[in-house]
UniProtKB/Swiss-Prot annotation:
It comes from the Bacteria. Its main location: cytoplasm. One of its GO terms (molecular function) is RNA binding. The lineage of its organism: Bacteria, Pseudomonadati, Campylobacterota, Epsilonproteobacteria, Campylobacterales. ATP binds at residue 233. It comes from Helicobacter hepaticus (strain ATCC 51449 / 3B1). It is an enzyme of class 6 (ligase). GO terms for cellular component: cytosol. The gene is tyrS. This is Tyrosine--tRNA ligase. GO terms for biological process: tyrosyl-tRNA aminoacylation. Its EC number is 6.1.1.1. Belongs to the class-I aminoacyl-tRNA synthetase family. TyrS type 2 subfamily. PROSITE patterns: AA_TRNA_LIGASE_I, S4. It is found in: Cytoplasm.
């Protein structure tokens, strides 16, 4: 019964699980002998700070820790300078080593908001990839063909559309796969857009004649606040794990009611049965969606702060939106005198694009210092402004 329960929790929410029986054997061995096994997941620090999208993987790693897994949290400081082409329609711009190092430091500091330090080792893939050398790289590339690389859907589309694919993009999955050779773990986790790369690691373990082939688990990508694209800092649709309790709580309440269930499944500690019961209560009118969403916001905010700050965030939110008050912890943005209002809204993170800003203004969603503004061509003069889009998006803008 213990093994069955452990495997149910481990497999919850996963998209695909390759080598599940091997993991069952490892978990059973842990229960019988106390012998632990190795689990890894890699994160390229392409932007500073972790967000809730990252925590889908982190929480699964934490689950493995409870059932005998020692986690190797891999920071791809080498591969981040190249850029993962997975799902991309064009070549990514490389990051500088300085940018990557600064971003990696934030990951290193924040990962223990989820993982147990006792069973976590932080690794950097520059340690072995810097030492690979020309001969090592040639040996590595000899294990894969161009035809095999073109099995990837994103590469195939770009090739058929005569879009550029750089050689280094072909090399990226091999370098990521070589991480599996260097660390020789039992299991690797990744987002469902990473399946090809994870299987490359499995193949390379076999090619380098290691004594195991890692099991592979893929997990869903968490949609961001827009409910469409995956959560990303570059799309400004993210909830950061270091954001203030007030901001985190308010952002969670801003997701739509349908997306709420996705967040429950991927982020909540409630069992699937409990989530189904909540959903039934909403569908039958015995619970209001807002109250259920507040429960989720309180749980997640408590996890990354504490219960007192989460309760204070709820009070602050209720004051803002039931009493039409302005939040006290507004993000502050600076713009130049004469900046176009649509551009200001994008800079302040209130709109994704100037075209969306125009639409919001036409819809009457814009308020500046509590006054509704309908002028799409407005240019702000020197001063400080409280800018608001809709009921829940605020920013303080300083024009200088």
């Amino acid at each position: 019964m213990k093994i069955k329960q452990a495997m149910q929790e481990i497999s919850r929410g996963c998209v695909e699980f390759i080598g599940e029986e091997y993991i069952r054997d490892l978990v059973e061995r842990f229960y019988n002998t106390g012998e632990r096994f190795c689990v890894k997941a890699g994160f390229d620090p392409t932007a500073p700070d972790l967000h809730l999208g990252h925590t889908v993987l982190l929480q699964k790693l934490a689950t493995f820790q409870r059932y005998g897994g020692d986690v190797k949290f891999l920071i791809g400081d080498f591969t981040a300078t190249i850029g993962d082409p997975s799902g991309k329609s064009e070549t990514r711009k490389p990051l500088s080593a300085e940018q990557v190092k600064a971003n990696a430091l934030t990951y290193k500091e924040q990962v223990f908001k989820v993982l147990d330090p006792q069973y976590t080792q932080i690794c950097f893939n520059s340690k072995w990839l810097n030492e690979l050398g020309a001969l090592g790289l040639i040996t590595l590339t000899s294990h894969f063909s161009v035809a095999r690389m073109l099995e990837r859907d994103d590469f195939t589309k770009r090739y058929n559309n005569n879009q550029s694919i750089s050689i280094v993009e072909f090399i990226y999955p091999l370098l990521q796969g070589y991480d599996s050779v260097a660390l020789n773990c039992d299991i690797e986790l990744g987002g469902n857009d990473q399946k090809f790369n994870l299987l490359v690691g499995r193949s390379l373990q076999r090619a380098y004649k290691l004594n195991k082939e890692q099991s592979v688990m893929t997990l869903p990508l968490l949609e961001g606040l827009d409910g469409v694209h995956k959560m990303s800092k570059s799309l400004n649709n993210y909830i950061g794990v270091t954001e203030s309790a007030n901001t985190m709580y308010a952002k969670i309440l801003s997701i739509n009611d349908e997306m709420m269930w996705r967040y429950y499944e991927l982020l909540s500690s409630l069992s699937l049965q409990e989530i189904v019961m909540l959903k039934e209560q909403v569908n039958t009118g015995n619970a209001h969606p807002k109250a259920v969403k507040e429960q989720l916001a309180l749980e997640i905010t408590t996890r990354y702060h504490n219960i007192d700050l989460a309760k204070q965030a709820k009070i602050a939110f209720d004051n803002v939106f039931s009493k039409d008050e302005i939040p006290t912890d507004l993000a502050v943005f600076t713009c130049n005198e004469g900046e176009w209002i649509a551009r200001v809204l994008v800079i302040a993170g209130l709109c994704e694009s100037t075209s969306q800003a125009r639409r919001d203004i036409r819809a009457g969603a814009l308020k500046i210092n509590k006054e509704k503004i309908m002028n799409e061509e407005l240019k702000l003069s020197v001063g400080e402004y409280i800018v608001q889009i809709g009921k829940r998006r605020f920013a303080k803008v300083i024009i200088s």
